[in-house]
Amino acid sequence: MIALFPHCGFLSETSRMLAIARALLARGEQVVVATHGGPYTRVLEEAGMPYTLLAPAMDARRCEEYLAGIVTLGKPGSRLQPADEVRAGVRSEVEFLRAHGARMVVIGFTLTAYLSARVVGIPLAASHGGSYVPPVFEQGLAPAPSQSPVPQLDWLPASMQKLMANFGPPRMRAPVAFLNEIAAELGVEPVPSLAALMLGDLTLVTDVPEVLGVSDACMSAWRPNGHRAYRAETRLRYVGPLYARLDLPIPERAEAFLDDGARPTAYVALSSSTPAFIRRVVAGVRDAGLRVLVGATIHELRDLENPDVMVEGILPSHRVMPRVTVALIMGGQGSVQTAMASGTPFVGFPLQPEQELNVALAARQGMAIAIGPRRADEAKVARAVRAIITQPAYAAAAVRVQQHYAGIDGAGRAADAVIGHLRNVNENPSTLHSARGTRFS
């Protein structure tokens, strides 16, 4: 049995876990899904995927706090989860994993599973780090941020900020203290660093060498080699792009809006943001003269509607993006890869270092512009949109990048990597030596 623990506060992660679960089922594996809740459990329900709600359950407000905590992770004094929530989460996860005889757990941002997997003594696969992996730091590929994670450091030169972006994550211990305090209580292996919080015993690297700039051979051969920043069993495997392909139709009125191609149309899909930020971005796009289709997801934005602005809820972005001139998205890898796979240039608003990398990879290819959310006033948004629609090089670059992702079944390759890792563990039990945890007391 393979368990999947999506954090359903993230639309991209929920859809990613759903895709992996389906691919595992198609390969004859037994799968169970559990989550601590969130507004996107509806995606699982609408897909007919059974799941168990684990304690403590996160309501919409707690999910908002959690997402905000992810963005500020690493800032002095920030703590993602209180100790009682971590203890309760680990306890319920351990009970679930043992009850179902799970042999492996696949996670996104359900970070308490770093401890529950060790308590149960099973390997953990992680997909939430995307391309934010050690070879990126070691080769200096993490970019200078579009805005510093700490506003007081915005004045630093880009060269210094890039050095910090590559040097810092493996050396930052404070962001994982919220887990390691409980790991010490349980007598299980801690999470050594912020960088390790994006990795698993099997790390599903959801990109391709042509985009990330790290060869397949280098990725597969990478080992911690005693580096204290990483758990000793960490392994990396390219699986290719893995983004949402929600089995939803485009609503009829949105179809009609997209078919009316008299003027360029922009797609605004900023699910991990605030209504105020979405309104600001929409205003900037309108200043640039484009019509706007808004994927509002959980936000109430109907008052924005007029003949040139349409607001819908959750939309199948992989079907919408190929039909628009430009997209405006955050920096999550799912959204970025949807644009890249669609051949659609975009403006990205990265919230944190991993998202900075995602947007930078597209910008390096010539198909995207990054704007730090703190700096994204209406005028900057309008200038970026005008640049993309008036300079054909952006659209041409997007079409070139699209070819890198063509025909790759990321979910299928992720499922194959999970199955292969389990097979290796079964054949070489010593690979789990650091994962044997204590009994939960």
Regions found by a protein language model. Give the residues of each.
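Active-site-proximal region of nucleotide-activated glycan assembly enzymes
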Residues: 125-213, 219-232
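Glycosyltransferase specificity loop/lid
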Residues: 1-157, 280, 285-286, 291-341, ...
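Short, basic, glycine/proline-bearing loop/turn elements
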Residues: 6, 75-81, 97, 175-179, ...
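A short, charged/proline- and glycine-enriched loop
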Residues: 1, 200, 261-265
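Generic alpha-helical structural element
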Residues: 164, 168-171, 270, 387, ...
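Generic detection of long, well-ordered alpha-helical segments
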Residues: 83, 87, 168-176, 194, ...
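Donor-nucleotide binding loops and adjacent catalytic segments primarily
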Residues: 207-326
